[in-house]
């Protein structure tokens, strides 16, 4: 009966140790040199026998999974535009660097069973990127205590390392731009739900507070749920409405069309996130991009640099800029 084809059998035929075969096939660099003759002998045996090592064997010998987890911290907003941009960018960047991506969805059971830790202990992942984390996600503290490599993407939480887009100053700029054009009755549709929204709120208030703005709060500000907030904001008779995201701004625009309120002649309007519809609605909305793809690419790059070269995982901020459209045209057409 033929012997089973595995790393040990390849090592026997190539006249070297199983660990040498593993290092040759994985490309892992170690302090133990491998001669070119030995490397070629291993590759020749593998080619002759059409051998592909078991992923379990490779992980056992290399002590690496070659996989980075991408964890959506909670089960809500799975159809978010920025989530899809982030996941695609992470997959693309990791693949280019020799890693695969394991998509994961956070849930109460996921946390209760300690899957965020067990994935590392089972050698299923080498690192973890967490998208959309919030203060209530205490499993982040457990990751930090265990010393496993992880990075937050889009939201900051405490001292945990994160890659995110600047969002306070951009809201201040958009709000101040409305004020500079004469707006005094300012309304805001805002949320306190997570660091990104709180930064947007802070920027809005920094510019608008001298004018006693009317602020209307929601949670995730999803288009299907934000119509009542749009009505409440318009009922306050504003000459500018600053929205924390584009979906809220779209709701305001729809209500303005029904009420005969002209944008931007009667009302200045801004949003946030640069979703696709914001550019193609009847009055294209001035907004800003959360830089999801850029943040995700940097996050993947930092994680790989940490795993391969020991680079520290640190918080990084990416700048943002206004995207001027018809709802708040750029001054002087510049």
What function would you assign to each model-found segment?
Residues 1-63:
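N-terminal helix-turn-helix DNA-binding module of bacterial transcription factors
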Residues 2, 6, 63-176, 180, ...:
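Alpha-helical recognition/docking segments in bacterial nutrient-uptake
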Residues 20-22, 60-77, 185-191:
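Short beta-strand segments enriched in small/hydrophobic residues
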Residues 94-106, 186-188, 205-225:
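Short beta-strand elements in bilobed, periplasmic/extracellular small-molecule ligand-binding domains
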Residues 124-132, 185-190, 216, 235-248, ...:
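Periplasmic-binding protein-like
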Residues 162-188, 198, 223-231, 249, ...:
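Hydrophobic alpha-helical segments within soluble ligand-binding/sensing domains
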Residues 174-214, 312-328:
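An alpha-beta-alpha
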Residues 230-334:
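Flexible loop/turn connectors
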């Amino acid at each position: 009966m033929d012997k089973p084809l595995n790393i040990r059998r390849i090592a026997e035929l190539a006249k070297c140790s199983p660990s040498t075969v593993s290092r040759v096939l994985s490309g892992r660099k170690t302090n133990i040199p491998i001669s070119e003759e030995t490397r070629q002998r291993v590759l020749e045996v593998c080619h002759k026998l059409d051998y592909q090592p078991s992923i379990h064997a490779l992980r056992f010998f290399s002590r690496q999974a070659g996989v980075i987890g991408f964890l959506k911290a909670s089960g809500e907003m799975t159809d978010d535009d920025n989530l899809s941009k982030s996941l695609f960018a992470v997959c693309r960047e990791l693949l280019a660097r020799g890693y695969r991506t394991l998509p994961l969805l956070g849930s109460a059971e996921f946390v209760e069973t300690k899957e965020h830790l067990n994935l590392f202990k089972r050698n299923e992942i080498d690192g973890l990127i967490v998208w959309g984390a919030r203060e209530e996600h205490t499993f982040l503290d457990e990751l930090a205590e265990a010393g496993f490599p992880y990075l937050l993407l889009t939201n900051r939480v405490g001292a945990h390392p994160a890659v995110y887009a600047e969002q306070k100053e951009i809201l201040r700029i958009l709000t101040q731009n409305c004020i500079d054009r004469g707006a005094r009755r300012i309304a805001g549709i805002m949320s306190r739900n997570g660091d990104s929204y709180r930064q947007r709120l802070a920027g809005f208030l920094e510019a608008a507070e001298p004018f006693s703005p009317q602020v209307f709060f929601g949670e995730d500000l999803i288009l299907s749920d934000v119509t009542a907030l749009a009505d409440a904001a318009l009922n306050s008779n504003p000459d500018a409405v600053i929205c924390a995201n584009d979906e809220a701004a779209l709701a305001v625009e729809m209500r303005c069309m029904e009420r005969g309120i002209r944008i931007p002649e009667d009302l200045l309007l801004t949003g946030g996130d640069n979703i696709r519809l914001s550019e193609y609605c009847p009055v294209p909305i001035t907004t800003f991009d959360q830089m999801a793809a850029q943040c995700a690419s940097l996050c993947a790059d930092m994680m790989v640099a940490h795993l391969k070269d020991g680079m520290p995982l640190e918080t990084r901020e990416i700048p943002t800029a206004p995207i001027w459209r018809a709802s708040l045209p750029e001054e002087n057409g510049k």
